[in-house]
Structures are given as structure tokens and as C-alpha cells.
Amino acid sequence: MSVLTFFRRRPPRHSGPKRVLVPFTGGELDPVVLDAAIRVAQAEDATLVPAYLIVTPLEYALDTPMQHEVAVAMPLLEAVEHAALRAGLAVDARVETGRTPTHALHRLWDAERFDRIIAPAPAGGGHGFTPKELQWILVHAPSETLILRPDPTLAKGFRLARTLDAVA
């Protein structure tokens, strides 16, 4: 897994539990990224905030219900919630709309505070944020941001010599 970390400025200290935002779009969240986000939230004793970002086309009003997108988002958010609850984490799932994924993120950042943001980068041509969107996230994020990109060979089902058995 590749990790890119960008420190913008030291976020102001807030009272209350820490919050780790994991935004995703495109109908999937890579399980490797989810596992890493859960481990980070556990280490920081934080609430995991998975956020499904819905892109609303220009021909619709921004607050138009996107029933098909919500039908895709809810099972994904439930799966993330179950995984986090099994790990003993508090979960506060979100669905946010916008004209683009970055617009939806901006709307979410304006409404709530987050102590850390973990954004998934696509592996092997999968769904997710584009390189341009990831760059925007790094520049505009209000708190410490990690970009996680799973090993593309793992996405294809190939295991490289990464286990102790393979190395020995």
C-alpha cells in the first residue's frame, strides 16, 4: 500500500472525540483502505466517519433526492459500519451531495470538523478520486490528510512475497 501524507497546518484542538473522515464515491470503498482507516481510528481512539459522496448532475437541483445513488450508498455504509463496530469503533456515517466529489467534500468540511481525513486513491483503474481531485483534497483539506492507494497487484488477486512464509 502506498501512503502519501500532507501536513497542512496544525489543526486547532477541539474538545470531544476525534473524528476520522473516510470519503468515497463510485459505489465502492477498497477493503484495504477501510482496514487502514479502522486501524488509524483505533490508534487515535476516534470516531470513524465514512462519507459517501453523491454527484448531482447540473440538470437537477442540488437538494434533489438521488434515490438510485442512495440505494447504492446505504449498503456500503452499513458494511463499513459493521466492520467498524466489530473493531470496537464508534461510527457516524454521512451522505453528502455536490456537483463534483470535491464540491461535496467542501460542503461536508463546511458543516463539520474532522481531525484527520483518509482519502482512497484508485488502485488498478478502480473507482475513486481522480489524481486531480486528490491534489485538490491535499491543498484544501482543513486537517491532516492521508491518501491511501492499495497495491494494484493485490486488487487483481495476486499476492506478492509479502508474508513471512513467502519471505522465509
Language model features with spans:
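Aromatic/hydrophobic pocket-lining residues that form π-stacking "cages" and hydrophobic walls in ligand
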Residues: 37, 80, 105
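Glycine-rich, Arg-bearing micro-motifs that act as flexible, cationic patches
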Residues: 118-141, 154-158
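Small/aliphatic-rich secondary-structure junction motif
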Residues: 9-67, 92, 140-151, 164-168
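Conserved hydrophobic residues forming the short capping helix/wall of the S-adenosyl-L-methionine
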Residues: 41, 80-84, 109
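Structural beta-alpha unit
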Residues: 1-13, 86-117, 122-123, 135
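A conditional alpha-helix N-cap/helix-loop micro-motif detector
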Residues: 30, 73, 98-99, 127
